[in-house]
């Protein structure tokens, strides 16, 4: 006869089943197997999850092995003149940026699209595996870029009330694991989202809870744009003022008069400087410590309003896109224009670059073409559109249907107007990631572009 299990043993077994596995308790051999499937960029992320993961990656020299693997993929891969066997001589960030650039310019392009909203939306923000979409619909939605699962919804009074939104990386809760493909129980939640709703600042917290700034402190003339870096949000207004709000005291701490016309776009820097673009074609550099603007940048070549501003923290260069299709580069240390080029026959809606990338940026606009642009010269290095062939598949939870396409590169002498509009929907917003980007199209669908060398 088989042994009969006692009640105490049965309870103990159930208790063991219910005890969650901590990431700290995973065996080094198991971690090694999991890490062997990750590329260099995911490995770098994993080094900062916890000390035990960092120790395993360093002890087994997994970063060096990944660098060697990428180095030997082919002659087009970024190379290094130093020995890859000596950890101290590997500049992982430099290697990653070179690989990122090569993927954007020469990699195979895979596109995954899904209907993210029931109404048109024009904006998207991406931070480390999370995507926030909205402006145009009655809700903002927070998505996982691994599973395309909608993790949270944030409701609005009405569809037309949300003008702009943002969230800060520092406001993310802990990540249980960054090896997303191998752990299904990952929970990543944005603690705080800041939105410009009508003439008020609103804050959404976990589970969609919304709070509004007090009437006296949070009301201002019509706001046209907003950016947020904890602890401040800056709102660009129709009357040409930029209003700085302290998110902790919920008060307007400063009003800066730019005298450059309605403010249409903003960009904030880590050192508290912010840039504002106007419909009159001026860019104003402001410092919250001063009541007056630091400088005003104005093109002598082009006319038209400023549509987008992208600031490179590492080089102190500002990239500016206009309604006339021009992109210009300004050195904020000298307040001098370095170059100005017309990259598109139509309005440029969005310019983005990776935070640490000093070589390539991406521009998109009304003609629906993604353009990879050299940051140093303004030369268009590559032009990308969608292929017209596609297939569909459902996510594991059947929450969304994914449309899969290939991207294709367009030669510089090809006339864009002769390409069908269905493969180049207008690009209203770009969110940039490592070897990937997300685009909104002022429609119901969101697109994820992935660039791979392998």
From Swiss-Prot:
Residues 20-66 form the F-box domain. InterPro entries: F-box-like_dom_sf, F-box_dom, FBXW2, WD40/YVTN_repeat-like_dom_sf, WD40_repeat_dom_sf, WD40_rpt. The keyword Oxidoreductase does not apply. Keywords: Repeat, WD repeat. WD repeats lie at residues 85-116, 117-153, 170-214, 215-255, 258-296, 301-340, 343-383, 422-454. Transmembrane segments: none annotated. This is F-box/WD-40 repeat-containing protein At3g52030.
